């Protein structure tokens, strides 16, 4: 078994797979890099930048990967009655978690996920100006794409881990340590043919105008301050990744929605976790 590691998606991505599959790992990393380029909030040539700059109501050509992620985002937006919203870019720019840029005036971007229309597999229309940030879902999609590539290359088993958002497949149990909000690993779960994602924000906050803000946004576009970790197990990493954000804001709702997506939440406490 070998493990390869690359910086990507704002974290480090590790791929563990059997010896002799180095070329497959390279192709998987290339798929991850493609997702990063297309869905970056920061890069001027990304699909998000094109949607941000487009005239409201204009059809915009984007990568099919971007369409797939936006389609899932819309589905989750409806399933959570609007709580999961990928147009939180305006809030994150205001609190300093995302760069403002020279052209961004926050009052010019009032749109929400319900204003996004999927035209076809390569075209999207935003009916109001908006700042889309896919940081709460794209990493999971990138992990899923890497797994698809590895399988297409004939790799029998592998683990793809993007900073704690991971997916495992094959005939083995992969031991996965769950890192709590304070950075300690107190619980290890076996991962077999599933995806696992965790979120917390104890170490990722800013003081803005006299109050703490985090990267996780809940009801009323307010920051969610969580001193605990939430962990979701699902069949796909895109679902696991997104549902951790919902669970931080409303655990009861997340548990209800998880049932619709063949997922489940792990019970957590300040010192560990249990099924």
Predicted regions and their residues:
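Mature catalytic core of soluble alpha/beta enzymes
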Residues: 1-275
């Amino acid at each position: 078994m070998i493990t390869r590691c690359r910086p990507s998606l704002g974290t480090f991505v590790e791929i563990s797979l059997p010896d002799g599959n180095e070329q497959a790992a390279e192709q998987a990393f290339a798929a991850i890099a493609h997702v990063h380029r297309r869905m970056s909030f920061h890069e001027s040539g990304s699909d998000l930048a094109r949607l941000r700059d487009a005239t409201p109501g204009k059809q915009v050509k984007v990568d099919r990967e971007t369409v797939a992620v936006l389609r899932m985002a819309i589905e989750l937006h409806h399933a959570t009655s609007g709580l999961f919203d990928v147009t939180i870019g305006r809030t994150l720019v205001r609190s300093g978690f995302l760069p403002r840029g020279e052209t961004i005036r926050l009052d010019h971007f009032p749109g929400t996920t319900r204003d996004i229309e999927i035209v076809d597999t390569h075209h999207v229309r935003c009916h109001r100006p908006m700042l889309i940030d896919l940081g709460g879902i794209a990493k999971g999609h990138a992990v899923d794409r890497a797994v698809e590539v590895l399988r297409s290359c004939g790799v029998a088993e592998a683990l793809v881990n993007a900073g704690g958002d991971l997916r495992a497949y094959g005939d083995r149990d992969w031991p996965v340590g769950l890192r709590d909000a304070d950075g300690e690993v107190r619980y290890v779960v076996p991962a077999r043919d599933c995806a696992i994602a965790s979120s917390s924000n104890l170490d990722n906050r800013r003081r803005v105008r006299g109050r703490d803000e985090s990267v996780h946004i809940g009801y009323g576009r307010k920051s969610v301050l969580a001193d605990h970790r939430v962990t979701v197990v699902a069949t796909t990493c895109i679902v696991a990744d997104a549902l951790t954000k919902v669970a931080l804001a409303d655990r009861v709702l997340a548990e209800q929605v998880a049932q619709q997506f063949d997922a489940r939440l792990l019970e957590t406490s300040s010192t560990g976790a249990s099924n």
